[in-house]
Each structure stands twice: as C-alpha cells, then as structure tokens.
Amino acid sequence: EQPLMRQVLARMALRLEGHTALLFRLARAWESRSNEGELIYSRLLTPAAKYSICRQGMPFIAEAMEVLGGIGYCEESELPRLYREMPVNSIWEGSGNIMCLDVLRSLHKLPGALEMLQFELQPVRGQNRLFDHAWRQWQQRARQPSEEMGRLLTQQLFDLCCAAQLLQHASPQVADAWCHLTLDHRGESLLSAEVCELLLNRAIGG
C-alpha cells in the first residue's frame, strides 16, 4: 500500500513482463530454426538475452531481498542461495563481453540479419515514438558496429525486441511503460498509479 514500494515492485514486475515476453518469442524461434529468419533471430537474441538477463539478475535478487528485509536475508529463504549463485550465470558458457561479441559477429556474418530485424519489428512501428526513435538509432549504429559499442548495441537490441513483443501482445499501458523504462534517453520516469496497479495485479495473479 506504500506508494514508494509500489513503484519498486511494479518496476520489478515490468522487467519480468518484458523478459518473459521476449523469451517466449525466442523459444518459438528455436523451435523453427529450419526457417532462415527464425535461425537468425535465435542466433542474435540468445546471446543478447543471456547478457542482459544475467547482468540484471544480481541487482534484481538483491532488490527482492531488500523488499523482504531480514526474512529475505535468512537462509530459510530461497533468495540468499539465488543471490550467491546468480553471478555464475554471467560466467557459465561465456562472460558478458563474449555474449556481446557473439551478437556483433552474428550481425557481421549472417546475411540478412538487419533485414530480418526490420521485418520482425515492422508490425509495431508507429505505435510508440520512443521505440521508433531507438530503433532508428540502433540501425544506424549497427550498420558499422565497433567492438567498443558491443554492450550498448546488445542491450539496446534486447530492449527493443522486448518492446516489440509487448507492443504486439501486452496491454498498451504495459508496453508504453516498458518503452519509457528502457528506451527513453532522458532517464526513467515514474509509473502511473494505474500502471502500477495493473502490473502488481498481474504479478500476484489477480
């Protein structure tokens, strides 16, 4: 019932909404790898998802522990074990930098990678100005990517593809909130009370 805590929890729920939507889309791509476009999607978004989700995992679990207070810190809770084990996800089968280099390599070596992304994101163009601006910016950077831009390009690609899934399949309020959270260069803004209510109800199965 506390407004500040509702913001914290709603932002966590929003992250889960975006990540879950993208992972379901990625699973579909893995099931259809005989299709060239789906193969390219899986090659690009698998390392991008691993990079982004694993990097956000540690602060996410830490936030969850803080929300619960002492209960979250005690070993009777599952959270301490998750917090200790979370760093291995960014190391196992390749560090964050390796994942980003994999994305850059796929952009360079896979014919039609940019065309596939244009086709994938075309249905949601025009629905959100932040998405449209970020997508134009990403395409400009991706045409001549440099290694030092690897993390930026990978994170932006992940956020854009999450946004595309939410713009297609989630409520307009949730999709718009995601775009403001991840694609607005001016920084994060407060979630409205209506969006907080929507996200928290979904998170608890209401």
Where do the protein language model's features map onto the residues?
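Flavin-dependent oxidoreductase catalytic core characteristic
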Residues: 1-206
